[in-house]
């Protein structure tokens, strides 16, 4: 409880929600709660409860400071093993930029040795003064480790809340949109004409980021808003600690302007850039909970997403999986559209065994996203619908026959509509860089496009 009729929990606790109910300890009444905002990257959700009875006698929690190592911590929740409240105690083991499993992102996290189990998610963690130092959210499980739990610190929680208050919605944590390499090797620094033991090398710039206008591959970032960046990709943190460079970025908000000190060709210069959330070509979560889909003569098209990959991992080809892992969006709104399955009918004879194949073009026009595909189908006046797939496979349907068969196919398979509700409206092409859509290749990256990259390489 944080006051003003609002509650906090983990985003994964209310994922795909249709109705959320909450109740207080010692109360036998459940109250309906409304999800106001859901932060996938930070795994936080903001809820509101309108009933005055729920808030009677309730006191909001006080947010405490970021703890120190070995500070005592108490975790409260309702984990597996019983129905009543559970309290476990431990100490703070580590504070660093941590991988958030739910959003595949990296933000500041607190590692503790107090027991955290399924059901603890969304519960508060307290210090000895009774102040809330964060929200329990995940645990590390391994045969070689035990008692490694994680808490979202109040600094991340406060950023989420301020983002919501500023914009009336949650916009997300921003990024620079670059792939960086550490500069710990002296020969590498000398080759790049970096005079001191500092800086990180720009290896890739995301086409959708604002810094694509000011940074180039081969630039070396040596400062961020005046803070020096070390050659191992860290910056000063508190009095005598260092932390990953991306921590500074996570303290900013979408739309904030920053000053970068860079070395280019041996010369130092300063550039300005605007931060904004990362554009994911393949989203980790489906916004709204329901996937977009379009059915054309039994051919079911949908955007590629991580949930789809997890569901169909055995049937998704290596080429498509590689593209999902290593490609970057070249413009906002870009999607990888796949034919997920075929609802067998005489109109699509010969295509029944197709599944999880990427569709590239319709009647010669490259497909930008699922809504664009729906628009191309609707606006087609020719005799045929010609779909071009990856690996040069061709699917041709007679347009009139396809339209005539649609209603019977939907009826046979018990499907209420040929497309999802988000595709019902008119298509608006808002893509600014139209030349990017004509290119055949996506922005391939030398490393996985997951936030945490690989050893020596990091996304920021």
Which residue ranges define each predicted feature?
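PDZ domains, with a preference for the canonical peptide-binding region formed by the helix
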Residues: 13-15, 212, 223-261, 361-391
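Active-site region of chymotrypsin-like
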Residues: 50-60, 86-146, 195-198, 203, ...
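Catalytic nucleophile loop of clan PA
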Residues: 1, 115-135, 211-217, 351, ...
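A conserved glycine-rich beta-strand in the N-terminal activation segment of trypsin-fold
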Residues: 1-4, 29-32, 87, 121-122, ...
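Active-site-proximal beta-strands of protease catalytic cores
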Residues: 6-11, 66-79, 91, 112-116, ...
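C-terminal, low-ordered peptide segments at domain boundaries
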Residues: 55-62, 69, 232, 246-247, ...
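PDZ/PDZ-like groove recognition
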Residues: 166-227, 302-352
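Conserved active-site neighborhood of the chymotrypsin/trypsin-like protease fold
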Residues: 2-85, 118, 268-270
């Amino acid at each position: 409880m944080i006051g003003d009729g609002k509650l906090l929990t983990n985003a994964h606790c209310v994922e795909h929600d249709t109705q959320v109910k909450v109740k207080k300890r010692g109360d036998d009444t459940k109250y309906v709660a409304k999800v106001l905002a859901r932060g996938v990257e930070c795994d936080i959700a903001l809820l509101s409860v309108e009933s005055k009875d729920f808030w009677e006698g309730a006191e909001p929690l006080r947010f405490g400071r970021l703890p120190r190592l070995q500070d005592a911590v108490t975790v409260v929740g309702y984990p597996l093993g019983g129905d009543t409240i559970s309290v476990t105690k431990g100490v703070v083991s580590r504070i660093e930029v941590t991988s958030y499993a739910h959003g595949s992102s990296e933000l500041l996290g607190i590692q503790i040795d107090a027991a955290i189990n399924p059901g603890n998610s969304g519960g508060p963690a307290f210090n000895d003064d009774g102040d809330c130092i964060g929200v329990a959210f995940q645990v590390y499980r391994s045969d070689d480790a035990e008692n490694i739990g994680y808490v979202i610190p109040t600094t991340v929680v406060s950023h989420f809340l301020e983002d919501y208050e500023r914009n009336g919605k949650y916009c997300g944590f921003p990024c620079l949109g670059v792939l960086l390499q550490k500069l710990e090797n002296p020969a590498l620094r000398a080759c790049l004409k970096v005079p001191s033991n500092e800086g990180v090398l720009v290896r890739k710039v995301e086409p959708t980021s604002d810094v694509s206008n000011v940074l180039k591959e081969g630039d070396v970032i040596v400062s961020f808003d005046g803070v020096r960046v070390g050659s191992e990709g860290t910056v000063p943190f508190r009095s005598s600690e260092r932390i990953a460079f991306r921590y500074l970025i996570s303290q900013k908000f979408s739309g904030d302007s920053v000053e970068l000190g860079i070395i280019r060709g041996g010369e130092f210069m300063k550039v300005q850039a605007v931060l904004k959330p990362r554009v994911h070509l393949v989203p980790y979560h489906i916004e709204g909970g329901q996937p977009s889909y379009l059915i054309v003569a039994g051919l079911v098209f949908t955007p590629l997403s991580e949930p789809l990959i997890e569901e169909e991992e055995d049937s998704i080809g290596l080429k498509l999986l590689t593209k999902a892992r290593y490609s970057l969006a070249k413009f906002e709104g870009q999607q990888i559209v796949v034919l997920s399955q075929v609802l067998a009918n005489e109109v699509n004879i010969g295509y029944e065994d197709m599944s999880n194949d990427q569709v590239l073009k319709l009647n010669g026009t490259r497909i930008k996203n699922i809504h664009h595909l729906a628009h191309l189908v609707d606006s087609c006046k020719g005799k045929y619908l010609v779909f071009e797939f990856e690996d040069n496979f061709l699917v041709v349907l007679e347009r009139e026959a396809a339209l005539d068969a649609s209603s019977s196919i939907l009826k046979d398979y018990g499907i209420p509509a040929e497309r999802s509700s988000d595709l019902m409206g008119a298509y608006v092409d808002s893509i600014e860089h139209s030349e990017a859509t004509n290119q055949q290749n996506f922005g391939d990256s030398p490393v996985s496009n997951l936030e945490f990259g690989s050893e020596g390489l990091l996304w920021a």
